[in-house]
């Protein structure tokens, strides 16, 4: 296969397309695309590959245009069904298609119309002879022809629509009911669209088993979100579901990961809200956004509103740094959260709306918000068992050497957060690659095979990674978190 052959085939395909021979043009276009695909495998230069891929896309667009023209020409072709269909050929079940008019039997009239009836009988008797003409009223014949044509066309159109509907009908469209759309009457369309973008429609794909340790936190979130939907009759009255849960802890301990697990496992509408979502430069619009958020959550209930870094939105009121606009937003948020408890208002736990919040600065949160977040749980640093489990989760896709002892590595990581442990694993997994490419030129690195790069991670790699990656949380920070949770915690 040569470039000259590809060039000649492209030239022939374009010439046939210009001459109107679209069938031959499509054959050449398809051959050119296949030849270019084979040629791309032999090209090693990245720049040339990009250029050839761009040319392939342009040729593919030309082929699609020719294909569209062929489809358009096919639609112009008349059906071979005769227009003058007999009356018994039409389906009797189609009520909207009028039946053809019944021929009226003409009887000879007395008196002066005798001559006309004789002419009619003569023409009727000689109708089968060649060269004789039959007198038929032009308007009635034309109407009969039009009625027959309309009936046939109506039947064909209905069959085409029915076939198209059956073709487009997928199993997902049959099984999944149509979701209700939020009525945005009274609100700006842009505000509604901005909040709808924060609804997580795609699965974050984080399971409870992907989170090491944190048994109490997972148990509480299941009790607050999952169990009320499984046992709605139980969670009523004083047993109503929790309206708010606050996750407190150092950075990197898995608070956001727990929220992703809630979005994956709990099958509720999940709103991922940040401070930028509820902030606007126009006066009064931020409060409208807060109110609209909770109204949409009630509409799509059961729902979970996750507010990460809630201290940036609802910090302590009455300070000198507070602005009037932020104070109004806090007031609206507090009012809406107090009215969020769907279970306490209509005794229907399946229509609940729960606020799930996370913060690294719980001492900066307003007292009224702290009261509304009824469950305040501490997300601590992982224990020795949790660190070992987290190592297994992070390294499950890697090939480890026989000398790797995860229990010993976990003991050396005391004081490390979950994010720190993940960074250690990532750095250790890159050590073998760094040793392999040391001293090589870019061309030699590009020519390395996959087998040479995928080497097992050794214990020495983890020891070197531990020397490079330090813990990010100090003992003084841990003491401050434990003091706050001892005073205000509600686990």
Swiss-Prot record:
Gene: KATNA1
Residue span of region Interaction with KATNB1: 1-29
GO CC annotation terms, alphabetical: centrosome; Cul3-RING ubiquitin ligase complex; cytoplasm; katanin complex; microtubule; midbody; mitotic spindle pole; spindle
Keywords per UniProt: ATP-binding, Cell cycle, Cell division, Cytoplasm, Cytoskeleton, Isomerase, Microtubule, Mitosis, Nucleotide-binding, Phosphoprotein, Ubl conjugation
Organism field: Macaca fascicularis (Crab-eating macaque)
A Pfam family of this chain: Vps4_C
Subcellular location as annotated: Cytoplasm; Midbody; Cytoplasm, Cytoskeleton, Microtubule organizing center, Centrosome; Cytoplasm, Cytoskeleton, Spindle pole
Modified residues (Phosphoserine): 42, 109, 170
Cited HAMAP family: Katanin_p60_A1
Enzyme class, broadest EC rank: isomerase
Primary location class: cytoplasm
Taxonomic lineage from the root: Eukaryota, Metazoa, Chordata, Craniata, Vertebrata
Homology family: Belongs to the AAA ATPase family. Katanin p60 subunit A1 subfamily.
Entry protein name: Katanin p60 ATPase-containing subunit A1
SUPFAM superfamilies documented for this protein: P-loop containing nucleoside triphosphate hydrolases (SSF52540)
């Amino acid at each position: 296969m040569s470039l000259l052959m590809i060039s000649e085939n492209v030239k022939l395909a374009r010439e046939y397309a210009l001459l109107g021979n679209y069938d031959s043009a499509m054959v050449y276009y398809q051959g050119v695309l296949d030849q270019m695909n084979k040629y791309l495998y032999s090209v090693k230069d990245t720049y040339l590959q990009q250029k050839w891929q761009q040319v392939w896309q342009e040729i593919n667009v030309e082929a699609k245009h020719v294909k569209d023209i062929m489809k358009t020409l096919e639609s112009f072709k008349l059906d071979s069904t005769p227009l003058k269909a007999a009356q018994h050929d039409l389906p009797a079940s189609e009520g909207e298609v009028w039946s053809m008019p019944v021929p009226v039997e003409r009887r000879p009239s007395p008196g002066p119309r005798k001559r006309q009836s004789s002419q009619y009988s003569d023409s009727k008797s000689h109708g089968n002879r060649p060269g004789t003409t039959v007198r038929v009223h032009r308007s009635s014949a034309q109407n009969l022809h039009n009625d027959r044509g309309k009936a046939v066309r109506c039947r064909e159109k209905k069959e085409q629509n029915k076939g198209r509907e059956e073709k487009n009908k997928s199993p997902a469209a049959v099984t999944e009911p149509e979701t209700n759309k939020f009525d945005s009457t009274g609100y700006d369309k842009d505000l509604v669209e901005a909040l709808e973008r924060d609804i997580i429609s795609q699965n974050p794909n984080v399971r409870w088993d992907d989170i090491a340790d944190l048994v109490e936190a997972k148990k509480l979130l299941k009790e607050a979100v999952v169990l009320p939907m499984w046992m709605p009759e139980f969670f009523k009255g004083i047993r109503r579901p929790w309206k708010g849960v606050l996750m407190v802890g150092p950075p990197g301990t898995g608070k956001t990961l727990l929220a992703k697990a809630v979005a994956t496992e709990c099958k509720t509408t999940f709103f991922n809200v940040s401070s930028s979502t509820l902030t606007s430069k126009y006066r009064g619009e931020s409060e409208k956004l807060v109110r609209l958020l909770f109204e949409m959550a009630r509409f799509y209930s059961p729902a979970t509103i996750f507010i990460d870094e809630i201290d940036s939105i609802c910090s302590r009121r009455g300070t000198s740094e507070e602005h009037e606009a932020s104070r109004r937003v806090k007031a609206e948020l507090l009012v809406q959260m107090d009215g969020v408890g769907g279970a306490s208002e209509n005794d229907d736990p399946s229509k609940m709306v729960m606020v799930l919040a996370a913060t690294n600065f719980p001492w900066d949160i307003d007292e009224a918000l702290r009261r509304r977040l009824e469950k305040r749980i501490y997300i601590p640093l992982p224990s020795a068992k949790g660190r070992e489990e987290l190592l297994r989760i992070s390294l499950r896709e890697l090939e480890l050497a026989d000398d790797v002892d995860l229990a010993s590595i976990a003991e050396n990581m005391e004081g490390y957060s979950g994010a720190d442990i993940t960074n250690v694993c990532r750095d250790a997994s890159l050590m073998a690659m760094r040793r392999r490419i040391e001293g090589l030129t870019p061309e030699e690195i590009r020519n390395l095979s996959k087998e040479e790069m995928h080497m097992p991670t050794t214990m020495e790699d983890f020891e070197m990674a531990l020397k490079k990656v330090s813990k990010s949380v100090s003992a003084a920070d841990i003491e401050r978190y434990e003091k706050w949770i001892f005073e205000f915690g509600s686990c």
